[in-house]
Structures are given as C-alpha cells and as structure tokens.
Amino acid sequence: MTNVDVDHLDHFATFDNIVESFEQYVKKIDGPKVMCADDAVTAKIAAKQACRTYGRSINADVRAVNVVLADGRSRFDVEARQSGSSSLQVLVGSVDLPLRGEHNVLNATAALTMAMELGVEFVVAAQALSSFRGVARRFDMRGVDDGVTFVDDYAHLPNEIIAVLRGARDATDAWSRVVAVFQPNRFNRMSVMSSAYADAFGDADVVVVTDIYSSGTTPIPGVTGKLVVDAIERNHPGKRVEWIAQREELVSFLASTLTSGDLCISMGCGDVAQLPDEVISLRQSSRTNEARKR
C-alpha cells in the first residue's frame, strides 16, 4: 500500500471512513503485506499489523538511500533489515531505474520489498526494474514538436500532481517552462475538493485548467474548473493560471502559446489524454499553412 488520500467522499463521507476501509481490507490479506512508512496513514495501519515497510524514512524496514535523479532516470541504493528485527539496516544493492521522480523511487522500492518477501533475490528484482519503461499515461512521452516536449499523465489528485510536476524537474532538465494542463474530474469530487488543489501546481510555470470531465457524474450548478483556478490564485496570486473551458479554444491557446524549450504536461483521467496529439496536429498544420503563403 503506497498511501491513503482523500477521495470519493461521496461514497465514504469522511476520511476516517476511508482509513477504516483500508484497515479492514489489509486485515483480510493472508499473504505478505508491504506498506509505505513515509505516508502517515499507511504507517499507522502498518503499526497495527504484521507488515513489511518501505520508503525513505529511517523507520522503514527497506529504505531507498543515496537517491540521484538525473537524465530522466533514478539511481539509488537499497538498505534493509531482516524481517522481525530492529537491528541496523545493511546495504542490499543498487538500482538503476529508467523512470524519473521520487515517487517512482518509492514505487520501485515497494516492488523490491514485495519481491524479496516472496523469495526473489534482490539482484534479480533489481535487474527486472532496470528494463522497466513504465506504463501508459504515467509521464508518457507523447512527442516533440518544433522544440516543445509533450507528456501526458493520469494524475488527477493533488498529491499525484505534485509528484508528477516535481519529477519533471531533475538535476539535468533544462526546460524553459513547465506548462501544466489539468482536466478536473467528477463534479461531485470538485464540489468538495477543489480547494485541495491550491498548492498542487507549485512546480509549474504556467497552469491551464479545463472544464470538468464528468466521468458519468451529474453537473452541479456553480461547480466548474474555475473553482480550481480560484483556489490556486488565492494561495499563489503571482502564478499565471488560465481557465479555458472549451476544447477548441484550449487546443488553439496551447498551439500558439507553447514555444521551443517548453515542457507541456497534460494531466487528468478523462479525454485530456488525446490533447497532446490535437495540439501537435494543429501546430504542424499551422506551420504548413504559413509555408504555403510564402
């Protein structure tokens, strides 16, 4: 279990109910249980049960240390203590992961921890991770057009957005700007959670918010993507934040605003996944039309 966040309050009503649901779920698991020691909630759940913990925390049973984030990769060492022991941790080995971001270091450490719990040798698991290229819609490189790099990610909750944007800037990145395009999801979620996004875009130079992707939920009067914009502007009055509700206007804005050296990251769990292709297509057709006029 990586972390527990506020979500689906329309179903659970309170965060305490969410935590209780996870606690009951973990209790029913007969096999190995691996929990993140860096997350306060999962650490609390782990303390009540027989679990193996992982993370960057000194309290973790399996730790990622000496982390280097550069060249779009993550390199780190792994220390571990024997199961059931409180003794000092010992160096197990090193990992060279072809994925960027602290969150992927933690995910890889979780996978290593579970693999070792199941009897897989560390060197075998680490070798497998060294060739893991990630999955679709997780910092998914969608193309480079005239110097602009387009990335798409499924991130749609505040902590996910923070992790993605933080991961977009490693020691060797030289983007001119990071332009974050966020498509909020679910009217009922945004009606109670819009303010939670206020500090999620700190690592973006420009933030563009679209209208809400319904995911089958019913529109609520007054609940639009503008709520997210207002939340960001209240906490960060100097940040450039745009609210562009209509898709055609959004594509046109990005096609004309993005310049060479920019990184454009589209985020959300709706049809924003198609946005990079739409923007690239318009930019290319615009250049073709300009060339014909000469």
Label each region the model flagged:
Residues 1-150, 230:
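Acidic, Mg2+-coordinating active-site environments of NTP-dependent enzymes
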Residues 5-7, 39-40, 156, 184-187, ...:
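Short glycine-rich anion-binding loops that position phosphate/pyrophosphate groups of nucleotides
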Residues 9-17, 189-191, 217-221, 274-276:
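Glycine/threonine-rich flexible loop motifs
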Residues 29-33, 239-241, 262:
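Short active-site oxyanion
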Residues 135-137, 159, 167-236, 243-247:
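Active-site beta-alpha connecting loops in nucleotide-dependent enzymes
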Residues 209, 284-294:
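Short, flexible loop segments at boundaries between secondary-structure elements
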Residues 249-282:
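A glycine-rich beta-strand to alpha-helix segment
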